[in-house]
Regions:
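Helix-coil boundary and interhelical linker segments in multi-pass alpha-helical membrane proteins
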Residues: 1-8, 68-85, 116-123, 157-172
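N-terminal signal-anchor transmembrane alpha helix
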Residues: 2-32, 184
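C-terminal ends of transmembrane helices
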Residues: 21-24, 92-103, 129-137, 185-189
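Cytosolic, membrane-interface loops and tails of multi-pass inner-membrane proteins
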Residues: 23-53, 191-225
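Short, non-helical or kinked segments that cap or interrupt transmembrane helices
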Residues: 31-42, 98-115, 139-150
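Interfacial segments of multi-pass membrane proteins
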Residues: 47-50, 73-76, 93, 108-139, ...
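Multi-pass membrane catalytic core of lipid/isoprenoid biosynthesis enzymes
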Residues: 48-73
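Loop-to-transmembrane alpha-helix initiation sites
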Residues: 124-126, 140-149, 163-178
Length: 225
């Protein structure tokens, strides 16, 4: 089983490294998506750079990456801790893809795919909460930030009604997913548009809004040419 786990973790990282947003932007617009819009290699920036239809495709693809690898782990009868390791590797691949010199996306939808396969109810919360309460105010990233804090608490305190059979492993898995998100946001290269932003504010903006400045519109277009 150890060999299977190691191989699936490696496979998860490689599958996660497939940069759908980058490939779509290259194919449809002939551009490097990292140099346009917000610069993020993800579905949201695909919407800005390429368009709605292809943004939907990238969303489905990125969710599918995470879900597929957990499904493979389930087929091998792995426990929750082992499945979480595979899922985390897939998200790390998306965030730091070997195929793009480790300059990837934020892993939001890949994380959603992983969470949904680990616990459908937690996946539902992770999807509904940001879009129900924050999308009307165009602050989905803030919703993602808060729901990622809520999920481990929910897994720990409400595991029985949610049908979570391995609450400790699930809770720890959710905490690690939160940490991966935080590390990804804080280690992203600083954008020139934020050169006058104090470090404390920069960290706050990244943790809460996943951007370097407070102005959302200016951020999503700061690399547009």
């Amino acid at each position: 089983m150890l060999v299977q786990i190691i191989l699936l973790v490696i496979a998860g990282y490689l599958v996660g490294s497939i940069p759908a947003a980058y490939l779509v932007a290259r194919w449809r617009r002939g551009v490097d998506i990292r140099k346009h819009g917000s610069g993020n290699v993800g579905a949201a920036n695909t919407l800005t750079v390429v368009g709605k239809r292809w943004s939907v495709f990238v969303t489905i693809f990125d969710i599918g990456k995470g879900a597929l690898m957990i499904w493979f782990a389930q087929l091998l009868d792995m426990n929750v801790a082992q499945m979480a390791a595979v899922g985390i590797a897939t998200i790390v691949g998306h965030d730091w893809p070997v195929f793009l010199r480790f300059q990837g996306g934020r892993g939001v939808f890949t994380t959603l795919g992983v969470i949904t396969m680990l616990s459908p109810w937690l996946g539902l919360i992770a999807f509904v909460y940001p879009y129900l309460f924050f999308a009307p105010f165009k602050q989905v990233s803030l919703g993602v930030s808060t729901v990622m804090v809520i999920l481990p608490v929910t897994a720990a305190l409400a595991h029985e009604p949610l049908g979570i059979e391995e609450p400790m492993a699930t809770t720890v898995g959710m905490v690690i997913l939160l940490l991966v998100m935080i590390i990804r946001r804080l280690t992203a290269p600083r954008s020139p548009i934020s050169r006058d932003v104090p470090l404390r504010e920069l960290i706050t903006y990244r943790l809460l809004f996943d951007r370097d400045i407070r102005d959302r519109k200016a951020w999503i277009n700061h690399k547009r040419s």
